Amino acid sequence: TFDKFAGSSQAARAYCELDIVYEDPDIIIINKPAGMLSQPADDGEPSLVEYLTGYLLKKGDLTEEQLKTFRPSVCNRLDRNTSGMVCAGKSLAGLQFLSRIFHDRTLHKYYICLTKGKIEKPDHIRGYLHKDKKTNKVIVSRQEFKDSLPIETKYRPLGSNGKITLLEVELITGRTHQIRAHLAGTGHPLLGDTKYGDSEFNKQYIRHGVRHQLLHAYRLVIPETDQNFVAPAPELFCKIIKEENLEEAYHENLERNMGLRKNDHHSSSDRNACE
């Protein structure tokens, strides 16, 4: 259900089962499924913000009275069809902490994706990005140009079968469509990406149900608090990994990052999705 309260100052809320990776009195980290908006849109479709509000109200961590002066908010936005971890503040202190570590880049964000072709070596690529608001697409260049912003992306291949590569990406800057456009610019677009990808390559995977980019925000590291958060890949991602004989590379990387220590946390719902 979705309660929007049109024409009212009351906060909208919606209800669904959320995959909680981590939660304390101030912050919450949610494993967002592909297809869900991170933040409210103009058309009124419920987003993770409304689902979070509903979750906290139902749980009793938030009251209608508190909502008059504070509303929970997400601190990092994923594209609708990108899955993975989104951080949100449950309190003003939580929002301030998350905003600071995102701004200072003392929180490290890692993604996994499937890309066209064989990538053999790790790389640290830089460039400039400009968003065309009319088309909602970005342009990436190695040279600075008018109204462009600097971007930085690091990646390392986890495995490849020659046709497709399982890639880990560390997002240094967090611009709109950065990973998708930056990798496409290197000749290795994301599998399933209808905006920046290779349409002929994508067509080969439609029969498997791939209709969006296979990009998943799977790991967050906060050195300041010695915390490591992991959200294993969703079912469709794992299905393609298995089809392409990349399971071993995926599991080796996951086990390396999920050698859980005292302050480490991981998502529960997809923990065994690739088994």
Which residue stretches match the model-derived regions?
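Residue-level signal for inorganic ion chemistry
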Residues: N31-K32, C87, C113, Y155, ...
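Conserved nucleotide-binding/hydrolysis micro-motifs of P-loop NTPases
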Residues: I27, A34-M36, L92-G94, G117-K121, ...
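Glycine/acidic-rich beta-strand-loop module
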Residues: T63-H103
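Short Pro/Gly-enriched beta-strand edge/turn motifs at strand-loop
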Residues: F2, T135-V138, P150, S199-Y205
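Conserved beta/loop motifs at nucleotide-recognition and modification sites
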Residues: T1-E45, E50, P122-Y128
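Glycine- and acidic-residue-rich catalytic/RNA-contacting loop of pseudouridine synthases
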Residues: M36-L62, F97, L114-T165, A181, ...
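Pseudouridine synthases involved in rRNA/tRNA modification
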Residues: A6-D26, M36, F145-K146, I172, ...
